[in-house]
């Protein structure tokens, strides 16, 4: 099977429900399974006599999640036609010219799609009366009114599509009285079509239940004499198809993917050691915070670098605010923190430009706070004799700006944390003291230079950018590595490295300080020997 070039990978056997006809159901299921959206393939794909014309590629995940071809958001949706010798009866949705309203959606489906849509109507909304879907008596009356004689096979097709026959064939094991409740008017109002009911079929006194407007289908059937018969059937199938589409696209639909991701996040939150006032995460936070506080009080470094001590204490204070708001369930305090200590497009739209800086002082999780403060503290100790308070503030502001812009360019999710500043300090250390040796805690016997750490960080962020694609998480929703990559702002980290690069370039080229070396020259000099 070919993989999709779009934002998801198609499933071989998507969930489409119980078929009305076994043979047609298999064909329809196979078509749904093999049809993938690719920008280069705009030709017909034949499988079991079914031709498929895929639409152009779109970057919208919601459109490409539906493999059925019933997307109401495109007028050029796929057309599925069943060809079986002389028995050619495609069901093409049309709206009469006298009742077409601006913006109405045109529908094109196949007989197999019709069976599937009848299955949806009968399974999801069994409480609707059969008159809504149109009976064969109404169709024959409409044909006689137009001076046409209904063909036998066409009448049989319409008669077989009535609700009673569908219930008997589609739900052989269902018990009486087990129908789900009928949805309210407000739940389907967003999917109503603006076209009026065909007056030739349904008179002015006929009205759709729940306030639903109706559209008309035009069915062409070739009889034995070769004449083409055309008749209209009032239906509300597109309205219910809009609501039932997610279940047709299997586990890659937006609805099921969102539910599964939400369930996974709830399970992870229940296992998080940070939850609860007396949890291990909270106790660990208090201990580490106390040690950090006493270190600030007795350290001579912070007496000369009070700005660094203020930075660490501000991060600890904001983190304490997040913890208190989560523990006490104070919605007002939580809203205040979300508005003023989180960087997102909504806050920028409300002219909260200062969130570029305040979000770099904010941490919600214990691990994120401890790791960032540990790295920043260690790197600043090494750079304490090279960077002044002015350099510290300038580099912090530049890292906050570049990291925030880098994240907003590729993601709409809110972001917070001082990781960009940590990466900017790491780049500064690599250009100032490239031969400084570091030992990583999990592997202490494998020392790395500061230059190697920057190279490893760049490779890791590139790997995170590759793994953070929605296609991988849709294919492997239970993977913890992919969920971790989704929660990491790799673009913000790269923005922090870019901030360090810009600041070192300014120091070297503008101020003429030759102690700031070029990263590219260092890589050419020590790249081969280090590895």
UniProtKB/Swiss-Prot annotation:
Key words, A-Z: Hydrolase, Membrane, Protease, Serine protease, Transmembrane, Transmembrane helix
GO cellular component, one term: membrane
Region spans: Disordered: 150-190
EC number(s) from the headed UniProt entry: 3.4.21.105
Active site: 419 (nucleophile), 493
Alphabetized PANTHER family for the sequence: PRESENILIN-ASSOCIATED RHOMBOID-LIKE PROTEIN, MITOCHONDRIAL, RHOMBOID PROTEASE
Function: Putative serine protease involved in intramembrane proteolysis and the subsequent release of polypeptides from their membrane anchors.
Protein's name according to its UniProt entry: Rhomboid-like protease 6
């Amino acid at each position: 099977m070919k993989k999709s070039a779009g934002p998801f990978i198609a499933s071989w056997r998507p969930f489409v429900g119980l078929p009305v006809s076994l043979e047609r159901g298999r064909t329809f299921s196979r078509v749904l399974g093999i049809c993938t959206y690719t920008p280069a393939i705009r030709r017909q794909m034949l499988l079991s006599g079914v031709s498929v014309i895929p639409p152009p590629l779109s970057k919208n995940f919601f459109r490409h999640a539906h493999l059925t071809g019933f997307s109401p958001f495109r007028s050029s949706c796929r057309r599925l036609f069943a060809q079986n010798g002389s028995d050619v009866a495609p069901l093409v949705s049309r709206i009469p010219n006298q009742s077409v309203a601006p913006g109405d959606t045109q529908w094109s489906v196949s007989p197999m799609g019709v069976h599937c849509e009848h299955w949806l109507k009968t399974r999801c909304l069994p409480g609707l009366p059969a008159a809504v879907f149109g009976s064969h008596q109404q169709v024959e009356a409409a044909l006689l009114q137009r001076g046409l004689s209904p063909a036998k096979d066409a009448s049989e097709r319409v008669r077989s599509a009535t609700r009673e026959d569908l219930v008997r064939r589609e739900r052989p094991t269902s018990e009486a009285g087990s129908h789900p409740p009928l949805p309210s008017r407000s739940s389907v109002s967003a999917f109503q079509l603006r076209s009026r009911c065909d007056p030739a079929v349904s008179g002015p006194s006929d009205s759709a239940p729940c306030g639903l407007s109706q559209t008309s289908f035009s069915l062409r059937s070739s009889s034995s004499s070769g004449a083409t018969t055309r008749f209209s059937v009032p239906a509300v199938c597109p309205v219910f198809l809009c609501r039932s589409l997610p279940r047709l696209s299997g586990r890659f639909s937006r609805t099921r993917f969102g539910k599964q991701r939400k369930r996974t996040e709830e399970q992870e939150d229940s296992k998080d050691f940070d939850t609860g006032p007396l949890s291990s995460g909270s106790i660990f936070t208090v201990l580490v915070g106390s040690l950090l506080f006493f270190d600030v009080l007795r350290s001579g470094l912070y007496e000369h670098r009070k700005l660094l001590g203020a930075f660490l204490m501000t991060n600890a204070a904001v983190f304490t605010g997040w913890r208190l708001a989560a523990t006490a369930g104070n919605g007002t305090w939580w809203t205040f923190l979300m508005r003023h200590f989180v960087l997102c497009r909504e806050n920028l739209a409300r002219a909260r430009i200062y969130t570029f800086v305040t979000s770099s002082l904010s941490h919600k999780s214990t691990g994120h706070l401890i790791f960032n403060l540990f790295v920043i503290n260690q790197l600043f100790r090494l750079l304490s004799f090279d960077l002044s308070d002015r350099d510290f503030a300038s580099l912090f502001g530049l890292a906050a700006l570049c990291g925030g812009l880098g994240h907003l360019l590729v993601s709409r999710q809110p972001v917070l944390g001082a990781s960009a500043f940590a990466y900017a300090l790491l780049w500064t250390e690599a250009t100032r003291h490239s031969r400084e040796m570091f030992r990583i805690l999990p592997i202490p016997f494998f020392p790395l230079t500061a230059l190697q750490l920057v190279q490893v960080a760049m490779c890791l962020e590139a790997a995170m950018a590759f793994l953070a694609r929605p296609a991988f998480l849709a294919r492997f929703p239970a993977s913890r590595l992919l969920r971790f990559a989704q929660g990491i702002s790799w673009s913000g980290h790269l923005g922090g490295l870019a901030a360090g690069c810009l600041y070192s370039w300014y120091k070297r080229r503008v101020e003429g300080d030759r102690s700031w070396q070029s990263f590219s020259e260092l890589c050419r000099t020590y790249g081969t020997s280090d590895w």
